[in-house]
């Protein structure tokens, strides 16, 4: 049963298979480690991450994976209290082809909606991920073109 709706084992198997493949594609080992870390306290939460978040939502093809990851980075930045998840999804955005500049741009956009502290914290998280990955951003001011 998924959200109170009876589901066949084949449907659940398909969701899990899709979810595991998508989780691996976006987050590589980090996502798997998060799910595994839940096995001793809340394995069902790990199942929901795989089957719902990645098997249903992230596997939907209406948005590109880059767009989906940028939306996720925006939301996690705006929350302001999800730094570990934000770093995983910044890394995931890079994994699916988002540019570092686009990632920073959506984080900066959140200053308007969730405040400068959340945007500053988001930029700090991005800086760490970029340093770990050895990637940089274009430092030009997009309004003036100055470097």
State what each model feature region is.
Residues 3-66, 95, 120-147:
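Acidic, glycine/proline-rich low-complexity segments that act as flexible tails and inter-domain linkers
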Residues 22, 53, 88-89, 106:
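A general alpha-helix detector
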Residues 47-50, 80-86:
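Short acidic alpha-helix initiation/capping motifs at coil-to-helix transition points
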Residues 64, 82-104, 117-129:
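Extended intrinsically disordered, low-complexity coil regions enriched in Ser, Thr, Gly, Ala
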Residues 68-76, 86, 106-107:
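Short, structured motif recognition centered on aromatic/hydrophobic residues
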Residues 77-78, 96, 109-116:
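A short structural micro-motif
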Residues 104, 108, 140-142:
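Alpha-helical transmembrane segments and their immediate juxtamembrane flanks
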């Amino acid at each position: 049963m998924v959200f109170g709706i009876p589901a066949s084992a084949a449907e659940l198997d398909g969701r899990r298979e899709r979810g595991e493949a998508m989780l691996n594609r976006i987050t590589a080992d980090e996502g798997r480690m998060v799910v595994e870390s839940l096995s001793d306290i809340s394995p069902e939460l790990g199942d929901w991450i795989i089957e719902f978040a990645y098997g249903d939502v992230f596997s939907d093809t209406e948005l590109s994976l880059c767009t989906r990851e940028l939306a996720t980075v925006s939301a996690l930045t705006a929350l302001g209290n999800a730094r570990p998840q934000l770093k995983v999804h910044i890394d995931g955005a890079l994994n699916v082809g988002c540019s570092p500049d686009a990632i920073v741009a959506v984080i900066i956009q959140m200053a308007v909606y969730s405040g400068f502290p959340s945007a500053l914290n988001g930029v700090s998280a991005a800086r760490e991920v970029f340093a770990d990955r050895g990637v940089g951003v274009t430092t030009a001011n997009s309004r003036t073109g100055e470097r």
